[in-house]
Amino acid sequence: MEALGKLKQFDAYPKTLEDFRVKTCGGATVTIVSGLLMLLLFLSELQYYLTTEVHPELYVDKSRGDKLKINIDVLFPHMPCAYLSIDAMDVAGEQQLDVEHNLFKQRLDKDGIPVSSEAERHELGKVEVTVFDPDSLDPDRCESCYGAEAEDIKCCNTCEDVREAYRRRGWAFKNPDTIEQCRREGFSQKMQEQKNEGCQVYGFLEVNKVAGNFHFAPGKSFQQSHVHVHDLQSFGLDNINMTHYIQHLSFGEDYPGIVNPLDHTNVTAPQASMMFQYFVKVVPTVYMKVDGEVLRTNQFSVTRHEKVANGLLGDQGLPGVFVLYELSPMMVKLTEKHRSFTHFLTGVCAIIGGMFTVAGLIDSLIYHSARAIQKKIDLGKTT
């Protein structure tokens, strides 16, 4: 018993008799409010604990021979799909000219609404032109390429075949009305029909994981004296409006929390024949989810430059939208981890202890202030 008596001396929480305790309305109000605040803070701490935290690390990128996937969704409200060409090239010398695989073009009217394709007839003003039936032609025919024949191109049975043969030769495709295939297919009428339309380009490119560029520009692209050029003979520089809206542009798959800086970027061309250049720095990124799934992707930063392209060759540039990218030699590794349970317990204890302490101080202040005022009232000293 004597030992228990000595032990009681260490009690930091001495108790008072129930008869000496006073309960007040102010104390009840403080208790209820502090209890609700404590509950809200606890739920907030619990929600924070149930989320994952991401730990970044930096490494040297040692990956070799990988492909880079570029996701694209860009709108050109004043550039018809028939005029627009998409090309990609890199420092290794690989080129993808007038890319069509994995990339799609959607025609848009002047209000930005998708235009449904009409397979049988096109309306040009008040004149209706019936599109020819290709099945009516001899399937074994071999039509002229108009001087652009090559070892692998002996016959040009369609207007597109002639354009491709001209492109390989590096010749400008000036007057389609002199080409029988184009006249038969109504090429000029189609171009005229789409004159006031826009175009949405969406899909993806797969390129080598080296520095390079891809661009959207009017005219058929080809090589001339080892220089990449576009045939703009039939356009006129004053008619080229490169206003564009980038709905989405990313390098690889999205991961939680990623920010693609070019998403929802709207750029209005201040004048005709503008050249827009986006200089992109791509940072390889590995995102490791808490369940063990590994996502290899990229994040990037970008700066923009624009100028008027008055010429078709040389330093004056080419009208269009150019994305020039280079890859960082460093790789970022992002790892998801569960939050510490001991940290959660510490936070909960801090909330409970802090609220009890603050509530006790407020209750004591209210109680003693009320008693002091009541004493003055009883003594008749209040004014």
From Swiss-Prot:
Subcellular location field: Endoplasmic reticulum-Golgi intermediate compartment membrane; Golgi apparatus, cis-Golgi network membrane; Endoplasmic reticulum membrane
Keyword field contains DNA-binding: no
Residues spanning the membrane: 26-46, 342-362
Residues that bear N-acetylmethionine: M1
InterPro entries assigned to the protein according to its UniProt record, in alphabetical order: Erv, Erv_C, Erv_N
Ranges where the record places region Required for MARCHF2-mediated degradation: 1-25
Any Pfam family: COPIIcoated_ERV
GO term, biological process aspect, one: positive regulation of intracellular protein transport
Keywords for the protein's UniProt record, in alphabetical order: Acetylation, Endoplasmic reticulum, ER-Golgi transport, Glycoprotein, Golgi apparatus, Membrane, Phosphoprotein, Transmembrane, Transmembrane helix, Transport
Result of altering K8R: Reduces MARCHF2-mediated ubiquitination and degradation. No effect on interaction with MARCHF2. Reduces MARCHF2-mediated ubiquitination and degradation by 90%
Glycosylation sites: N241, N266
Lumenal topological domain residue ranges: 47-341
Primary site of residence: endoplasmic reticulum
Topology of the protein relative to the lipid bilayer: Multi-pass membrane protein
Modification type Phosphoserine: residues: S116
GO CC, alphabetical: COPII-coated ER to Golgi transport vesicle; endoplasmic reticulum; endoplasmic reticulum membrane; endoplasmic reticulum-Golgi intermediate compartment membrane; Golgi membrane; membrane; retrograde transporter complex, Golgi to ER; transporter complex
Ranges of the Cytoplasmic topological domain: 1-25, 363-383
Summary of subunit composition and partner proteins: Forms homodimers. May form a heteromeric complex composed of ERGIC1, ERGIC2 and ERGIC3. Within the complex, the interaction with ERGIC1 is direct. Interacts with ERGIC1/ERGIC32. Interacts with ERGIC2, the interaction is required for the stable expression of both proteins. Interacts with MARCHF2. Interacts with alpha1-antitrypsin/SERPINA1 and HP/haptoglobin.
Function as written in the Swiss-Prot or TrEMBL entry: Possible role in transport between endoplasmic reticulum and Golgi. Positively regulates trafficking of the secretory proteins SERPINA1/alpha1-antitrypsin and HP/haptoglobin.
Family, similarity comment: Belongs to the ERGIC family.
PANTHER family: ENDOPLASMIC RETICULUM-GOLGI INTERMEDIATE COMPARTMENT PROTEIN, ENDOPLASMIC RETICULUM-GOLGI INTERMEDIATE COMPARTMENT PROTEIN 3
Name the record gives this protein: Endoplasmic reticulum-Golgi intermediate compartment protein 3
Gene that this sequence comes from: ERGIC3
